[in-house]
Amino acid sequence: MTTARYCLLLSSLLCFSLLPVALLAEEAVMLEGEALTRVVPGSFYFEGRIGPTQMRNAAAVRFGEKRHIIAALVDTSGYSSDIRAKYEGFFITDSRITFGDKELAAGAYGFGVTKESKFNIFDVGGNLLLSVAGAKDSATRTPRPLALLKEDGGVRMYRGRSFV
């Protein structure tokens, strides 16, 4: 093998070995104002109904140029009581993520949080896809109804004092 080919092979291997590190290093940017309203849908479909988004209770995070995590509460007043009991809002991710200790594929989902801080993720048909035990943040004095916050090198989703 010539020196030029050896150097080319070595540099190619080095570039490809650093690619996952570069993808993981994408900084989380919290979206606000106009940037937030551009990515958060005005309403969300769930179990045959459309509920308007509560923009005051919406949050989004961007990683790099095209990866987003979006969450918002939805006005469920037009839903039946059994749907309102399990569905509080929507959660959208355009790439595979780890949600708590479980993997979640790219997609748009409904979510609800139980009194025991269990985060439940549903498909738009209302079928439970995963359930993750959350924790309580008792140090927060005035919790927001919904928030996405950068924590410990990742992003936490808060529903009141409960988070995952």
How should these model regions be labeled?
Residues 5-6, 44, 108:
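Intrinsically disordered, low-complexity N-terminal regions enriched in serine/proline/glycine
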Residues 76-125:
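Mid-length scaffold segments of soluble, non-membrane domains
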Residues 2, 108-111, 157:
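Conserved short hydrophobic patches within well-ordered secondary structure
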Residues 1-11:
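Bacterial N-terminal signal peptides that target proteins for export
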